[in-house]
């Protein structure tokens, strides 16, 4: 079984923020798989379906970003999911908005959701889909920026970015990390 985790914060006040782009991609992926994300389990919202013939669980942790690892570890232990079968989708300020970067393993890079997952899994070897949200301009606080709404320009591009992110996720699950990196890394998906 594969576990696809979209990182974000629960609640309507966070729904359309940059920090919740992981939720948005995971929700779009589940929708395209025909999976309903309504069941509460593992301190998150989950749905299970088949992606390219393999059972795949989509998880949206409801623990708030800084405790995402609690939800991920709970699902992994309950379902016997190996670390290499975990894919985490998250916002990345070090990439421009519209870019996607597939990565195998690595540190948390200051991202508290990743920090929680790495700390509680005791391992950093899971797959990541890093979603570029860009850096704040001027003296804007990073936390305020990622917890802020997308700009009107970003909103106009968001559907295209999400569609390409789902394509990247599908290639990652079907053909592996190297193929997904070759096809999607170092590209910006803006119209």
UniProtKB/Swiss-Prot annotation:
Which residues make up the annotated site Stabilizes the basic form of H active site to accept a proton?
Answer: 91
EC code(s) of this entry = 3.1.1.29
The active site annotation covers: 19 (proton acceptor)
Q: Enumerate the residues marked as the site Discriminates between blocked and unblocked aminoacyl-tRNA.
A: 9
Keyword tRNA-binding on entry: yes
Sorted alphabetically, which CDD domains does this protein's record hold? PTH (cd00462)
Q: Where, by residue number, does tRNA bind?
A: 14, 64, 66, 112
Q: Which PROSITE patterns match?
A: PEPT_TRNA_HYDROL_2 (PS01196)
Swiss-Prot/TrEMBL catalytic activity: an N-acyl-L-alpha-aminoacyl-tRNA + H2O = an N-acyl-L-amino acid + a tRNA + H(+)
The record ties this protein, via InterPro entries, to: Pept_tRNA_hydro, Pept_tRNA_hydro_CS, Pept_tRNA_hydro_sf
Gene Ontology biological process: protein quality control for misfolded or incompletely synthesized proteins; rescue of stalled ribosome
Which keywords does this chain's UniProt record carry? Cytoplasm, Hydrolase, RNA-binding, tRNA-binding
Q: Which GO terms describe its cellular component?
A: cytoplasm
Q: Member of which family?
A: Belongs to the PTH family.
Report the protein's function: Hydrolyzes ribosome-free peptidyl-tRNAs (with 1 or more amino acids incorporated), which drop off the ribosome during protein synthesis, or as a result of ribosome stalling. Catalyzes the release of premature peptidyl moieties from peptidyl-tRNA molecules trapped in stalled 50S ribosomal subunits, and thus maintains levels of free tRNAs and 50S ribosomes.
Recorded hits in NCBIfam families, A to Z, give: pth (TIGR00447)
Kindly provide the name given to this protein in its UniProt entry: Peptidyl-tRNA hydrolase
Which gene name belongs to this protein? pth
